[in-house]
């Protein structure tokens, strides 16, 4: 791969797969930003080896603008030097609500000589992971109530699991318990979406099952770095789904039966032993998506009333996608 193609891929990777956190190593002379993102289906490209370790990609960019010279950007990936170049354009905007920065890089070209490559000075403290709060997700969402609110027929809708959510037009669409009912919902550590709740009550007991409990290869996007010894909430990612549905459409209820009140009428809850996935097509009718199954094999219609269909903002949807390799593979097919 030539340097021009390599830099073209790097530019698009930085612009379309990274959100940034300003690092405490920044000074008046050199600005340091870090980003962490799940492994990419597109970068570093075919037949190119990923620098450093396996797992999430940790990126550091160090920006210097000497007097009377063009900006120089130095990139490290997983601690390995990748490139030192000049962006033909550069844009930076802080998003205080989430403690992140949006960086945009133009074409990457050779820097002016002489070019001194600075060492990687980014510092990272072993701090707890940072997650999107329920309030942040709700405040970023738009309610979809009518057929006119749904994506147009020509728009590709990508289902991420048997019960949603869906990605369309850069927005994550998911059924969520009506916010007015959240006070009644037992804490499951994340926004109580339909897919999360159904997976929660049907997950297997094997905590090493990546399908039910998530894997450790998720990136902590809001921290700007993913450390090797921590699991960053992958058990609440939309990629998680009951392992019992790998080869079928039925998942037996295994735990947390107190959550059934959000799924089925009171008179039928004691009879339901499993959940059947009916269709993962985006719809305003929840009863087209799943139903309950009794011991006798009879189907029980689910409740429609507790559920609202929300579309998350493009930025929050990017945060979710950038944290998960599986979602990237499904939704990020080209630059």
Swiss-Prot record:
<comment type="similarity">
    <text>Belongs to the herpesviridae cytoplasmic envelopment protein 2 family.</text>
</comment>
<dbReference type="GO" id="GO:0042025">
    <property type="term" value="C:host cell nucleus"/>
</dbReference>
<keyword id="KW-1048">Host nucleus</keyword>
<protein>
    <recommendedName>
        <fullName>Cytoplasmic envelopment protein 2</fullName>
    </recommendedName>
</protein>
<dbReference type="Pfam" id="PF03044">
    <property type="entry name" value="Herpes_UL16"/>
</dbReference>
<dbReference type="GO" id="GO:0030430">
    <property type="term" value="C:host cell cytoplasm"/>
</dbReference>
<comment type="subunit">
    <text>Interacts with cytoplasmic envelopment protein 3 and with the capsid.</text>
</comment>
<comment type="function">
    <text>Plays a critical role in cytoplasmic virus egress. Participates in the final step of tegumentation and envelope acquisition within the host cytoplasm by directly interacting with the capsid. Upon virion binding to target cell, a signaling cascade is triggered to disrupt the interaction with the capsid, thereby preparing capsid uncoating.</text>
</comment>
<keyword id="KW-1035">Host cytoplasm</keyword>
<dbReference type="InterPro" id="IPR004286">
    <property type="entry name" value="Herpes_UL16/UL94"/>
</dbReference>
<keyword id="KW-0920">Virion tegument</keyword>
<keyword id="KW-0946">Virion</keyword>
<keyword id="KW-0426">Late protein</keyword>
<dbReference type="GO" id="GO:0019033">
    <property type="term" value="C:viral tegument"/>
</dbReference>
């Amino acid at each position: 791969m030539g340097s021009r193609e390599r830099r073209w891929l790097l530019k698009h990777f930085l612009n379309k797969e990274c959100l940034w956190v300003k690092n405490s190593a920044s000074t008046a002379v050199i600005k340091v930003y870090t980003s962490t993102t799940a492994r990419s289906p597109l970068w570093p490209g075919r037949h190119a080896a990923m620098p450093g370790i396996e797992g999430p990609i940790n990126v550091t960019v160090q920006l210097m603008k000497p007097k009377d010279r063009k900006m120089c950007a130095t990139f490290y990936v997983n601690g390995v030097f990748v490139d030192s170049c000049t962006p033909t354009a550069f844009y930076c905007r802080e998003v205080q609500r989430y403690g992140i920065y949006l960086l945009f890089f133009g074409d990457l070209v050779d820097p002016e000589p002489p070019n001194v490559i600075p060492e990687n000075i980014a510092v990272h403290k072993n701090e707890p992971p940072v997650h999107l709060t329920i309030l942040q997700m709700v405040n970023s969402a738009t309610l979809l109530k009518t057929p006119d609110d749904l994506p147009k027929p020509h728009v590709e809708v990508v289902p991420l699991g048997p019960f949603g959510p869906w990605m369309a037009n850069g927005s994550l669409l998911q059924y969520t318990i009506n916010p007015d009912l959240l006070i009644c919902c037992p804490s499951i550590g994340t926004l109580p979406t339909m897919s999360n709740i159904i997976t929660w009550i049907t997950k297997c007991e094997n905590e090493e099952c990546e399908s039910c409990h998530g894997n450790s290869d998720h990136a902590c996007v809001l921290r700007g770095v993913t450390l090797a010894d921590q699991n960053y909430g992958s058990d609440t990612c939309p990629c998680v789904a009951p392992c019992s549905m790998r080869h079928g459409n039925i998942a037996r209820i295994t735990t947390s039966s107190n959550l059934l009140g959000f799924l089925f009428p009171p008179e039928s809850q004691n009879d339901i032993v499993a959940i059947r996935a009916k269709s993962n097509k985006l719809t305003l009718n929840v009863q087209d998506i799943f139903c309950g199954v009794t011991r006798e094999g009879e189907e029980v219609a689910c409740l429609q009333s507790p559920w609202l269909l929300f579309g998350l903002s493009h930025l929050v949807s990017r945060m979710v996608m950038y944290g998960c390799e599986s979602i990237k593979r499904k939704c990020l097919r080209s630059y």
